[in-house]
């Protein structure tokens, strides 16, 4: 096995998928930034959820908003619903794992808030339940998926934003999700701070 060749293919494949995603996602990402800014400027917050690598992405995004991304600015309200082990295990034990995010959305979400729902397959049952709870709370939904968008893609309304990565491999989808989250953070900072192109 030629590891150098295999590694090179990974980089090339990742770059190709990112360029393909640029065509599909640039405008929807800009729309998602505007929705998030609208919520944050009206004392709203962003609740983020996902499983596995997507849980890490939810935490990464919330940390960038609460702390900072690349520029100094005031903290922004964002909560990753993946971090409170007592709450997560209590809900999973007493009810069902499909409810671990939706119960938190019902407790913490308010009209005008935004749910950032991350699922590479678009079929994660607990993320789907979180979207249903967000509907009840009159929240907008920004969904990051891959493949064909799965069940989540079919659930979204006109007021929501679907950021579906045009790829099948989970690793490639996750790589584009991370870049997308960084684009969201950068867009939020630029609109909040009035930063011109650099």
UniProtKB/Swiss-Prot annotation:
CDD domains: SIS_GmhA (cd05006)
Cofactor binding note of this UniProt entry: Binds 1 zinc ion per subunit.
Main location: cytoplasm
EC number(s) recorded for this UniProt protein: 5.3.1.28
PROSITE patterns listed in its UniProt record: SIS
Subcellular location: Cytoplasm
Positions with a binding annotation for substrate: 51-53, 64, 93-94, 119-121, 124, 174
One of the record's GO molecular function terms: carbohydrate derivative binding
BP GO terms, sorted: carbohydrate metabolic process; D-glycero-D-manno-heptose 7-phosphate biosynthetic process
Catalytic function, reaction form: 2 D-sedoheptulose 7-phosphate = D-glycero-alpha-D-manno-heptose 7-phosphate + D-glycero-beta-D-manno-heptose 7-phosphate
Entries under InterPro entries matching the protein: GmhA/DiaA (IPR035461), Phosphoheptose_Isoase (IPR004515), SIS_dom (IPR001347), SIS_dom_sf (IPR046348), SIS_GmhA/DiaA_subfam (IPR050099)
GO cellular component, one term: cytoplasm
Signal peptide (UniProt feature, chain positions): none
Gene3D superfamilies: Glucose-6-phosphate isomerase like protein, domain 1
Keywords: Carbohydrate metabolism, Cytoplasm, Isomerase, Metal-binding, Zinc
Swiss-Prot/TrEMBL cofactor(s): Zn(2+)
Pathway stated in the Swiss-Prot or TrEMBL entry: Carbohydrate biosynthesis; D-glycero-D-manno-heptose 7-phosphate biosynthesis; D-glycero-alpha-D-manno-heptose 7-phosphate and D-glycero-beta-D-manno-heptose 7-phosphate from sedoheptulose 7-phosphate: step 1/1
Subunit structure: Homotetramer.
PANTHER family: DNAA INITIATOR-ASSOCIATING PROTEIN DIAA (PTHR30390:SF6), SEDOHEPTULOSE 7-PHOSPHATE ISOMERASE / DNAA INITIATOR-ASSOCIATING FACTOR FOR REPLICATION INITIATION (PTHR30390)
Other noteworthy facts: The reaction produces a racemic mixture of D-glycero-alpha-D-manno-heptose 7-phosphate and D-glycero-beta-D-manno-heptose 7-phosphate.
Family: Belongs to the SIS family. GmhA subfamily.
Protein name as it appears in the record: Phosphoheptose isomerase
């Amino acid at each position: 096995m030629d590891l150098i060749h295999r590694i090179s293919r990974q980089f090339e494949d990742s770059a190709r998928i990112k360029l393909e995603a640029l065509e599909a996602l640039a405008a929807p990402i800009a729309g998602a930034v505007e929705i998030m800014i609208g919520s944050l400027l009206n004392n709203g917050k962003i609740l983020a959820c996902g499983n596995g690598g997507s849980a890490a992405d939810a935490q990464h995004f919330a940390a960038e908003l609460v702390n900072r991304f690349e520029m100094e600015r005031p903290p922004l309200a964002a909560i990753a619903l993946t971090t409170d082990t007592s709450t997560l295990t209590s809900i999973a034990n007493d009810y069902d794992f499909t409810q671990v995010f939706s119960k938190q959305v019902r407790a913490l979400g308010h009209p005008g808030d935004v749910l950032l729902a991350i699922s590479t397959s678009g079929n994660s049952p607990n993320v789907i339940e979180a979207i249903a709870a967000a509907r009840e709370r009159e929240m907008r939904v920004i969904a990051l998926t891959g493949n064909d968008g799965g069940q989540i893609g079919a659930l979204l309304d006109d007021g929501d934003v679907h950021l579906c990565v045009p790829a099948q491999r989970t690793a490639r989808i996750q790589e584009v999700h991370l870049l997308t989250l960084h684009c969201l953070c950068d867009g939020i900072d630029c609109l909040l701070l009035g930063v011109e192109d650099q």
